[in-house]
Amino acid sequence: MKGGTMVENAQYLDASASAPGSTTPLETAWIRVREKLKSEVGEVEYRTWLRQIVLGPLEEDELTLYLPTRFLRDWVRSQYEERLQTLWRTEREDIKGVELQVKRGLPEVSMGDAEDGEDGSGEGHELATQAAAPESRSDLAVPLDPRFTFDTFIVGKPNEFAYACARRVAEKPSSPGFNPLFLYGGVGLGKTHLMHAIGTELTRTGKVSVAYMSAEKFMYRFIAAIRSQSTMEFKEQLRSVDVLMIDDLQFLIGKDNTQEEFFHTFNALVDAGRQIIVSADKSPSDLSGLEDRLRTRLGCGMVADIHATTFELRISILEAKAKASGTHVPSKVLEYLAHKITTNVRELEGALNRLIAHADLVGRPVTLDTTQDVLKDMLKAHDRRVTIEEIQRKVSEHWNIRLTDMSSARRARAVARPRQVAMYLAKQLTSRSLPEIGRKFGNRDHTTVMHAVNRVTELMDQDTSFAEDVELLRRMLEG
Ligand SMILES: Nc1ncnc2c1ncn2[C@@H]1O[C@H](COP(=O)(O)OP(=O)(O)OP(=O)(O)O)[C@@H](O)[C@H]1O
């Protein structure tokens, strides 16, 4: 658990229900954050996923937000965490990070997808299948995002091959040479979008049952099944679908039992002529840490890479999204965004949504001036974006240790101290949350990261030469 003093404490708060005059400053900020989120994502999405968030305590510079189940927490984390972090930091300078946690017994807003599983762990929906016809939906319901269709996917040079493969699988699942379909590429480039598009297309025809889940949820669900002694049921459910899609497979690295289970499921499905679709951040051959036999099988079908976006593709995506929003965004602004935000489509989309939401709220058109003003913090962060990988590399070079020791289990001080410094710098220089940082350091827990941050702060106070080292690294990284 976190240390430190509790500065502000707040409880459940509905943006529409509380009068600002009767709330604490933190609650008032929360109302504004929620309103912004609502206007960015729309009423339906807000009600489905975000309304359940409950304001928790602010301890030192870390704010906790609660969700009633692990399923919801994971979903909100994967889809909205970055946005929540940015909105909070814009709202309150004293908040440096936002942590999403599960808290049982919160007032849960009724919603089909958010009930607890049979073991009360909130994991019952982490395996989700969507049968073709609504009446034949099993007790497992899927969050296939209706916005992620082939129609809304913009095709350009970097993604045309992956798009064509996805289309082909949606038209003719289990075709020879296309099973499994392995989609890979960097963060936020459209892998999940394509998987959902395949799922939506297939279920539309009415004859195919599709199961989609992240590898992380596959693992949680598998562990929950072991705990509740229902692994047979879990296996049967999985093996009864026509199409199984697993997103972000890299999460299974280092999870040997779960990999084993996935391998058997994979074989059973492919042998029965069912389709498997997998996404990951690297190609099968580069996914070191996955069992060889699984890697080999994953590479046996069609492997399609989604490359980083080009300027032309970014412009086409922005044009399409601006058009769909119904708000006029001048082409100068679109070009400006496409030049400035080159990392991934998720960020590009987030920036555009923010501009449009701002224009709607203040009732003024989008201009280059308002763009620079509204996106000030985002663009600034872009100018000096530092990645955790860069931090790990620089710190390892500085102390002359192996890069792999950043994620290894070695505890020798010569390795552990630089690792702690890298965690500290990751917290200071990136917007990543503690659990995200932990994951990048060999799947360590967020409390380990918290401890590292505190320890390095303490040491910097006590030892000036250590403090100089850390400051030097920080300056080099900030460029
Ligand atoms: N070519 C595209 N056309 C339209 N929208 C896109 C395109 N590529 C990505 N997007 C949008 O960008 C956002 C991020 O995409 P998505 O979640 O599919 O990325 P991802 O590759 O799965 O990322 P991650 O590695 O984080 O899982 C989504 O809102 C998606 O709709």
UniProtKB/Swiss-Prot annotation:
Keywords: ATP-binding, Cytoplasm, DNA replication, DNA-binding, Lipid-binding, Nucleotide-binding. Residues 94-142 are annotated as: Domain II. Residues 1-94 are annotated as: Domain I, interacts with DnaA modulators. This is Chromosomal replication initiator protein DnaA. Residues 360-479 are annotated as: Domain IV, binds dsDNA. It is found in: Cytoplasm. Plays an essential role in the initiation and regulation of chromosomal replication. ATP-DnaA binds to the origin of replication (oriC) to initiate formation of the DNA replication initiation complex once per cell cycle. Binds the DnaA box (a 9 base pair repeat at the origin) and separates the double-stranded (ds)DNA. Forms a right-handed helical filament on oriC DNA; dsDNA binds to the exterior of the filament while single-stranded (ss)DNA is stabiized in the filament's interior. Residues 106-137 are annotated as: Disordered. GO terms for biological process: DNA replication initiation; regulation of DNA replication. Belongs to the DnaA family. The gene is dnaA. Oligomerizes as a right-handed, spiral filament on DNA at oriC.
